């Protein structure tokens, strides 16, 4: 058999003048070599053959074929179908890519000597599949209609630790679901979210991605996340923990993000090893953002430093007891866009501490300098704006409704007016001083304190 395979290799080498690619198939992995990449084909007796610096044991080769197809250099294509998965690796990087397939579970390790970035295209459907990748180079991941449900870990786990470009291919629907059999208290990355990224990721493409975080988060990212202009739709349909759990910083420039979570909607943690100016910040500059959370003592959006909102259409609805809409230890600056925040829970006691359902909470200044800001904080002790420092109404259109009053600084550049003991019915429209806010059906307050500035 080995001699037959060797003969086939020789025939492939000399008999494919009109063809374009030599496919070497080992199990579920195909290595695709162009004609010029087979010039240095070398045999070691009848045991192995080396093509483009990758050695193959002849006994491991299932099939060889010369096909009239092209494959781009520096690419890896992964296709799922039910309980199986197939991988095609471009020949020029064959020596650097080690790929394994078990059923529909794919593991790819890129060698540290890999000279260039690789583009991975992932597509297909599996109800019992996953994708894992590790390496040392920046990478591009094209989600080209990928639906994965992994019973016992993250559906997609990228561990390269470098710049990762995530592309939602135009017109595609992608869905990742992690497993209910995972251990929620397991500290390993594979159990942190439906999608795990160890690296800094930048997102683009007009497609759609839906995440189902049945164990913890929808997305866990160990470094910054940037959502670029023109991005399509990212939906966290469910998350037992946080919708988006991001380290370093989160920046949204565009796209549409919808989050439904029991934990925090977006949680941004500062990274001790980061020297980025934005470390710990949550930055919203554009796009459409909708967050709904329902847990006790959680936040719609929180971060470890400043929160900066300069654009976009942003809606944060928080229904859990003791939970807040926006929360940051640093300053919260709103300079543009339209932001609506609603909290409806009651005061809660957590570990002996009283937690109040405020709308916007900062340990530093809250500056409302532009855009539109509408806040309806819980009638049970919630303030629209609560701070340990100062509130400034510096030019934004503001209406803040709460169970307790919010009082801006006298140093504010724009005047403000306060009203008290106002009956705000569920779903009603509240208008004062030319500012109008239609509160949702889930909110009511029979003795509201209202702040208005324009």
Where are these regions (language model features)?
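Short N-terminal segments immediately surrounding and downstream of signal-peptide cleavage
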Residues: 20-38
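A composition-driven surface/loop motif
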Residues: 69-454
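Sec-dependent N-terminal signal peptides
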Residues: 4-13
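Extracellular interaction modules
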Residues: 55-60, 390-393
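Structured surface patches comprising rigid loops and adjacent beta-strands/short helices at the edges
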Residues: 34-43, 57-69
């Amino acid at each position: 058999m080995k001699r037959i395979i060797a003969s086939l290799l020789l025939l492939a080498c000399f008999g494919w003048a009109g063809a374009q690619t030599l496919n070497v198939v080992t199990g579920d992995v195909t290595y695709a070599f162009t004609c010029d990449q087979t010039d240095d084909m070398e045999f070691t007796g009848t045991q192995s053959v080396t093509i483009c610096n990758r050695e193959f044991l002849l006994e491991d080769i299932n099939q060889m074929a010369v096909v009239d197809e092209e494959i781009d250099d520096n690419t890896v294509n992964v296709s799922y179908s039910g309980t199986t998965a197939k991988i095609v690796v471009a020949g020029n990087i064959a020596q650097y890519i080690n790929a394994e397939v078990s059923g529909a579970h794919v593991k790819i390790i890129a060698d540290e000597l890999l000279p260039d970035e690789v583009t991975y295209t992932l597509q297909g459907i599996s109800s019992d599949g996953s994708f894992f990748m590790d390496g040392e180079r920046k990478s591009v991941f094209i989600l080209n209609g990928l639906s994965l449900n992994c019973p016992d870990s993250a559906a997609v786990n990228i561990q390269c630790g470098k710049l990762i470009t995530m592309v939602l291919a135009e017109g595609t629907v992608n869905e990742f679901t992690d497993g209910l059999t995972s251990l929620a208290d397991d500290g390993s990355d594979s159990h942190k979210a439906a999608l795990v990224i160890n690296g800094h990721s930048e997102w683009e493409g007009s497609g759609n991605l839906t995440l189902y975080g049945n164990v913890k988060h929808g997305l866990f990212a160990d470094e910054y996340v940037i959502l670029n202009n023109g991005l399509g739709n990212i939906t966290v349909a469910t998350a037992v923990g946080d919708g988006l759990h991001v380290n370093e910083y989160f920046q949204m420039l565009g796209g549409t993000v919808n989050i439904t979570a029991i934990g925090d909607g977006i949680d941004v943690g500062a990274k001790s090893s980061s020297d980025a100016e934005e470390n710990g910040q949550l930055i919203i500059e554009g796009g459409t953002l909708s967050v709904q959370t329902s847990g006790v003592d959680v936040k719609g959006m929180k971060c470890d430093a400043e929160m900066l909102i300069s654009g976009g259409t942003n809606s944060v609805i928080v229904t859990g007891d003791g939970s807040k809409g926006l929360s940051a230890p640093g300053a919260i600056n709103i300079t543009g866009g339209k932001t609506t925040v609603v909290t409806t829970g009651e005061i809660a006691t957590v570990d002996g501490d009283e937690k109040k359902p405020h709308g916007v909470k900062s340990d530093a200044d809250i500056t409302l300098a532009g855009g539109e800001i509408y806040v309806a904080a819980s009638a049970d002790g919630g303030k629209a704006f609560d701070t340990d420092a100062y509130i400034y109404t510096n030019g934004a259109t503001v209406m803040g409704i709460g169970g307790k009053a919010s009082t801006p600084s006298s140093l504010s550049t724009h005047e403000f007016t306060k009203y008290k003991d106002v009956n705000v019915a569920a779903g009603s429209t509240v208008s004062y001083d030319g500012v109008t806010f239609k509160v949702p059906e889930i909110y009511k307050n029979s003795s509201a304190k209202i702040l208005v500035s324009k």
